[in-house]
C-alpha cells in the first residue's frame, strides 16, 4: 500500500500507517487471549480498502467486517467494545472541554456551541445544564428523522439529506429540541377549562386576578412544549373581558375612579397597570423549562376593521361578544404603559405587532394609523403588519385564508390564532448557487433538487410529529391550543443577497436583482404549492438567522466559497450599505420582492434618531403604497452601565450622569436585547449596521 492521507475525527489529515492497523488487530486478539500469526493478520488486512481521504471511522468499520468475515467473532466483538469505550471517553472529554470554554466565554450567547441566543442573558449552572445535552439531542433528532425518511423515500434520500446537512447546503433549525417550533395559540381552551388539558391543575379563570396569574402560568406551560415563540393574539381581548366583568363595560370612560378600599386607594387605571406589571415582568423572567431564558412571547394589536374581520363572530363562554371600545382603549393604554416602562427596565417581551388594514395606499382606520405613528414618534419599538384585503384573513394576523393562493404566516409566531410553524428547514442559497455555477450546472435546476429534498424531509418530520401526537405527547394539539392542520412546515432561505453578489448583481432596486429574487423565491413557492395538501401547509421565510447567518458565512468561507461578510443578511438589501435611503429599503421589501415569501421577511428600518409623528405617518403611507407588509423601526436605546439610566435616543454618553460607559438595546433580529448580550459575532455585525438619518430624508 502506498502513502495515503487519512482524515482523523477532528477533521485533520495524517499519513496512513499500516502498522497502526496491524497493531490494533493484534491487540484485539490479545484482549480475548487468542493466538494470531502474521499470515492471519495479513489476510484480515487484505479485506480493507484504503484510499486517499479515507476516514478513521471507515477503516475501523472495515476492520470489524474483515474480522467477522474471517470468523473471528469474539475478536470482532472485543474490537467493537473497545471502539465504543473510546468513543464514550472522547465524548466525555469533549463535554469537559465545552464546559471549560463555556465558563470562560464572554457571555452565554458566545459560549453556546450550537445555537447562540441573546435571549439568554447570563451564564450560570442552569444555562450550562441546558447546553450540555444539546449534541445528544442533535444526534437523536437526526436519527429519528433519517429513519422516517428511509421508511417513506428510501435510504438513498436519507443519505442525501445527511450529506446536504453535513456539507452546509441546508440547515435544520432547532435540532437541539424535540419540540415543534413556534405557535400562535388560541386561549379559548384555557378560558373554559384552565390548564388541566395540558397537564396543569388550575381551573378556568373567574376574575381579573385569577386571569393575570393563570395567564402567566399558562404561557410558561405552553412555551415549555415549544422550541420557539409563543404568541397570544387574544391576550388583550380576554384581559378587556375580565376588566369589564370587574368594573363594568364602560370602565375606560372613568378610569380615574377610585375602586380600591385599601390604604393605597387605587384607581381603575392603576389596577389595570398593576395587571400589566404583574404579567410583563413575570414573563420576562428566565424560565427553568427553557434553559433559563425568558419565554419568547408575542402579542398583537388591531385597528377596528382588522379586529372586526378576525373576531366579529367571536363569543365568550357567557354568550357576550368582545367590546371594541374597551379593547381599543386598553390596547392604547398598554402600549403607552409598556413604552414608558422600557425606560425603567430592559423588557424584551412581549414582541408587539400592530395589525392594520389598508386601501388605496393608506390605512383604512385613520385613528389607528395616527396612533401607530404617534407611538413610533414617542420612541416605542414594535412591528407593524399591513394587509389590503380583509376577506383574505382568517383568525390570524399573519395567516391569509387558504381560499387565497398564497398563505402567509410569520414563524416568530406573532399574531395568529391556533397557527404557527411546526418545523423550519433552511436552504443556504449562497452555497447552493455557487456550487451549481462552479460545477457547470444550471443553478435553478440544482436549487429545484435541493428544494424538493427539503419538502420530502419536512413531510417526514410531519409524520414523526403526528406519531408523537398519537402517543399523547403533544397535549397542546389535543387540547386545541394549536391546530395541526393550520401549522406550517417552513422552508427557510438564507444567503440570498450574498448569492446575488456572487452573480455580479447590484443589490439595489433594479430589474436584474428583482428578477433574481423572484426566480429563486418563486422556485420555493412552486414546490410549496406542489406539496401542499388539505392536511399539510408549506410556507417560505427569509429566516432571521440570529445564529445560522454567522455559521453559514464561517462554513462557506472555510470551504472556499465567495463570502462578502461575516454574517449573512436577513434582508433584501445589504445591512451595512449607506447608499440606500429609507424609501429605497421600503421598496426593496415591497410587494414585488416579498411576493413569494409567504412566511415573512421583516424590514428592520435602522434609523439614527426618532422621526416626528407626521414623518412616521408618511412612512405608513409609503409602506402601504409599496406593499411592504411587515416592518419595524430600529433606533438603539442607550443604557448607562454606571447609573442604570435608559434613554430612548441613540447617544454616546448618559444624559443623566454624563458617563460614556454605555450599552445599547437594539433588535438582534426580531427582539430587543442589550448588545452586550449578543454573541461576539453578532456584536461585530451590529457594529457594521448602517443607521440612516430619516429626519432629513422623509418629508412630513
Question: Across the structure, where does each feature detected by a protein language model lie?
Answer:
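Short, hydrophobic beta-strand segments
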Residues: 4, 46-50, 312-313, 498-505, ...
Amino acid at each position: 500500500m502506498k502513502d495515503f492521507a487519512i482524515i482523523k475525527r477532528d477533521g485533520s489529515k495524517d499519513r496512513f500507517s499500516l502498522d497502526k492497523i496491524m497493531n490494533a488487530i493484534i491487540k484485539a486478539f490479545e484482549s480475548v487471549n487468542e493466538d494470531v500469526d502474521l499470515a492471519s493478520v495479513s489476510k484480515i488486512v487484505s479485506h480493507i480498502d484504503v484510499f486517499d481521504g479515507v476516514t478513521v471511522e471507515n477503516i475501523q468499520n472495515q476492520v470489524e467486517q474483515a474480522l467477522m468475515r474471517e470468523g473471528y467473532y469474539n475478536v470482532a466483538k472485543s474490537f467493537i467494545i473497545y471502539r465504543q469505550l473510546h468513543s464514550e471517553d472522547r465524548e466525555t472529554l469533549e463535554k469537559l472541554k465545552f464546559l471549560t470554554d463555556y465558563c470562560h466565554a464572554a457571555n452565554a450567547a458566545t459560549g453556546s456551541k450550537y445555537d447562540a441566543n441573546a435571549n439568554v442573558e447570563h451564564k450560570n449552572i442552569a444555562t450550562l445544564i441546558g447546553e450540555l445535552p444539546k449534541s445528544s439531542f442533535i444526534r437523536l433528532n437526526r436519527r429519528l428523522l433519517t429513519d422516517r425518511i428511509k421508511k417513506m423515500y428510501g435510504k438513498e434520500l436519507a443519505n442525501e439529506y445527511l450529506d446536504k446537512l453535513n456539507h452546509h447546503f441546508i440547515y435544520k433549525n432547532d435540532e437541539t429540541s424535540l419540540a415543534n417550533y413556534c405557535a400562535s395559540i388560541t386561549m379559548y381552551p384555557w378560558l373554559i377549562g384552565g390548564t388541566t388539558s395540558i397537564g396543569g391543575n388550575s381551573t378556568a379563570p373567574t376574575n381579573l386576578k385569577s386571569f393575570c396569574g393563570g395567564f402567566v402560568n399558562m404561557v410558561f406551560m405552553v412555551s415549555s412544549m415549544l422550541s420557539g415563540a409563543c404568541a397570544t393574539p387574544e391576550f388583550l381581548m380576554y384581559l378587556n373581558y375580565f376588566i369589564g366583568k370587574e368594573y363594568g363595560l364602560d370602565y375606560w370612560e372613568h378610569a380615574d375612579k377610585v375602586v380600591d378600599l385599601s390604604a393605597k386607594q387605587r384607581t381603575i387605571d392603576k389596577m389595570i397597570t398593576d395587571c400589566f406589571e404583574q404579567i410583563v415582568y413575570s414573563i420576562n423572567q428566565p424560565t427553568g423549562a427553557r434553559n433559563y431564558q425568558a419565554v419568547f412571547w408575542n402579542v398583537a394589536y388591531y385597528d377596528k376593521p382588522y379586529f372586526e374581520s378576525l373576531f366579529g363572530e367571536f363569543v365568550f363562554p357567557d354568550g357576550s361578544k368582545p367590546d371594541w371600545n374597551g379593547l381599543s382603549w386598553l390596547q392604547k393604554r398598554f402600549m403607552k404603559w409598556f413604552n414608558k416602562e422600557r425606560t425603567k427596565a430592559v423588557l424584551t417581551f412581549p414582541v408587539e405587532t400592530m395589525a392594520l388594514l389598508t386601501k388605496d395606499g393608506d390605512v383604512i382606520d385613520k385613528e389607528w394609523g395616527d396612533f401607530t405613528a404617534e407611538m413610533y414618534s414617542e420612541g416605542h419599538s414594535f412591528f407593524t403588519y399591513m394587509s389590503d384585503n380583509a376577506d383574505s384573513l382568517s383568525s390570524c394576523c399573519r395567516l391569509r385564508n387558504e381560499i387565497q393562493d398564497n398563505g402567509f404566516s410569520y414563524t416568530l409566531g406573532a399574531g395568529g390564532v391556533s397557527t404557527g410553524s411546526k418545523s423550519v428547514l433552511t436552504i443556504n442559497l449562497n452555497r447552493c448557487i455557487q456550487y451549481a455555477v462552479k460545477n457547470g450546472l444550471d443553478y435553478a435546476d440544482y436549487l429545484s433538487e435541493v428544494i424538493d429534498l427539503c419538502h420530502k424531509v419536512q413531510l417526514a418530520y410531519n409524520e414523526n410529529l403526528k406519531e408523537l401526537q398519537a402517543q399523547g405527547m403533544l397535549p397542546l394539539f389535543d387540547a386545541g391550543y394549536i391546530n395541526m392542520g393550520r401549522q406550517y412546515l417552513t422552508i427557510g432561505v438564507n444567503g440570498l443577497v450574498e448569492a446575488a453578489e456572487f452573480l455580479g448583481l447590484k443589490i439595489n432596486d433594479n430589474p436584474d436583482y428583482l428578477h433574481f429574487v423572484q426566480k429563486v423565491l418563486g422556485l420555493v413557492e412552486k414546490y410549496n404549492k406542489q406539496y401542499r395538501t388539505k392536511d399539510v401547509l408549506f410556507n417560505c421565510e427569509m429566516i432571521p438567522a440570529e445564529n445560522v447567518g454567522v455559521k453559514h458565512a464561517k462554513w462557506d468561507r472555510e470551504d472556499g466559497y465567495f463570502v462578502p461578510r461575516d454574517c449573512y443578511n436577513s434582508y433584501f438589501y445589504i445591512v451595512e450599505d449607506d447608499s440606500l435611503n429609507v424609501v429605497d429599503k421600503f421598496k426593496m421589501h415591497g410587494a414585488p420582492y416579498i411576493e413569494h415569501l409567504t412566511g415573512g421577511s421583516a424590514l428592520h428600518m435602522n434609523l439614527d434618531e426618532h422621526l416626528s409623528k407626521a414623518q412616521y405617518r408618511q412612512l405608513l403611507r409609503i409602506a402601504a403604497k409599496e406593499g411592504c407588509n411587515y416592518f419595524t423601526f430600529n433606533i438603539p436605546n442607550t443604557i448607562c452601565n454606571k447609573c442604570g439610566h435608559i434613554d430612548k435616543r441613540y447617544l454616546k454618553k448618559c444624559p443623566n450622569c454624563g458617563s460614556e460607559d454605555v450599552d445599547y438595546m437594539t433588535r438582534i433580529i426580531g427582539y430587543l436585547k442589550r448588545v452586550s448580550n449578543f454573541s461576539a459575532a453578532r456584536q461585530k455585525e451590529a457594529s457594521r449596521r448602517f443607521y440612516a438619518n430619516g429626519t432629513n430624508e422623509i418629508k412630513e
